From Swiss-Prot:
Annotated region described as Interaction with UL20, given as residue ranges: 265-301
Region annotation (Involved in fusion) ranges: 31-121
Residue intervals annotated with topology Extracellular: 31-121, 234-243, 323-338
Keywords from the UniProt entry: Glycoprotein, Host cell membrane, Host endosome, Host Golgi apparatus, Host membrane, Membrane, Signal, Syncytium formation induced by viral infection, Transmembrane, Transmembrane helix, Viral primary envelope fusion with host outer nuclear membrane, Viral release from host cell
Membrane topology: Multi-pass membrane protein
Localization per Swiss-Prot or TrEMBL: Host cell membrane; Host endosome membrane; Host Golgi apparatus membrane
Name the UniProt record assigns to this protein: Envelope glycoprotein K
Annotated gene: gK
TM region positions: 122-140, 213-233, 244-264, 302-322
Length: 338
């Protein structure tokens, strides 16, 4: 129940998703041929002991590549794109004496597809961070509904569990008799949890010492959150090496903007949550609506919200699959061919 239970976590998920989509768009469609590859070159008239220089394609220079594949084996599909932009060395006759023309001729000794490095490092970190943050959200929401939460006003009533309402409707409509076992179980769980929360707020150290499993669960939840955020922030801090000369300025600006927004959003929610008064008395329970309208309204709202969220998940997954199938050849052509 991501969209219903935690709007603050949904905000972060949306920003991470947008960051990944923008990065994927640049890798597949946005990168021009000048921003794809870098070449380790040496001037044609230079000695063999001259250091290699990494540079991107330059239309004012003539790049001469090796006529055959490297000794270690055939070129990878990613590297083949880079070698397709240069001329084979045996197809050009150089002057015997190095001159102005020879200084504009570069012998290519190695080529690297920077989009491959961008896909294997930055994009992979974003995807892993996205999944880890979703795992944190799922674990946190289950703990708010069934586990120990402090402050107490952060707890979610277990009676709102979707399976409880679904079981009651199925038993009433199809079996023609009320089914209340899940409801009684959730009520007992709510009473026990309120007692545990009071013990935890009174003495957290002793509470966690006698119940280490709860501490392990909370620790795993925090670990998932900070590792996910660390991976997202790491996408802006990792060194791109020689490939930095091929990335345009807007890619760097976009990366830092998304990383800053995600980090500041999480920091804001953490500080706002920590400033909430822990000794605040719980609000008085609202009066329950009488009649069929109140029962049906509350029941249907929770069920329909759960169904709507799950339909949104299915629609997103189906959309990604359909787009991948529709543009599969285009994506492969962008990544592997000219």
């Amino acid at each position: 129940m991501l969209a219903v239970r935690s709007l603050q976590h949904l905000t972060t998920v949306i920003f991470i998703t947008a960051y990944g989509l923008v990065l994927a768009w640049y890798i597949v469609f946005g990168a021009s041929p000048l921003h794809r590859c870098i070449y380790a070159v040496r001037p044609a008239g230079a000695h063999n002991d001259t250091a290699l220089v990494w540079m991107k394609i330059n239309q004012t220079l003539l790049f001469l590549g090796p006529p055959t594949a490297p000794p270690g084996g055939a070129w990878t599909p990613h590297a083949r794109v880079c070698y397709a932009n240069i001329i084979e060395g045996r197809a050009v006759s150089l002057p015997a004496i190095p001159g102005a023309m020879s200084r504009r001729v570069m012998n290519v000794h190695e080529a690297v597809n920077c989009l491959e490095a961008l896909w294997d490092t930055q994009m992979r970190l974003v995807v892993v961070g996205w999944f880890l943050y979703l795992a944190f959200v799922a674990l946190h929401q289950r703990r708010c509904m069934f586990g120990v939460v402090s402050p107490a006003h952060s707890m979610v009533a277990p009676a709102t569990y979707l399976l409880n309402y679904a079981g009651r409707i199925v038993s009433s409509v199809f079996l023609q008799y009320p089914y209340t076992k899940i409801t009684r179980l959730l009520c007992e769980l709510s009473v026990q949890r309120q007692t545990l929360v009071q013990l935890f707020e009174a003495d957290p150290v002793t509470f966690l010492y006698h119940r280490p499993a709860i501490g392990v669960i909370v620790g795993c939840e925090l670990l998932l959150r900070f590792v996910a955020l660390g991976l997202i922030v790491g996408t802006a801090l990792i060194s791109r090496g020689a490939c930095a000369i091929t990335h345009p300025l807007f890619l760097t600006i976009t990366t830092w903007c998304f990383v800053s927004i995600i980090a500041l959003t999480e920091l804001y929610f953490i500080l706002r949550r920590g400033s909430a008064p822990k000794n605040a008395e719980p609000a008085a329970p609202r009066g329950r609506s009488k009649g069929w309208s109140g029962v049906c309204g509350r029941c249907c709202s929770i069920i329909l919200s759960g169904i709507a969220v799950r339909l949104c998940y299915i629609a997103v997954v189906a959309g990604v699959v359909l787009v991948a199938l529709r543009y599969e050849q285009e994506i492969q052509r962008r990544l592997f061919d000219l």
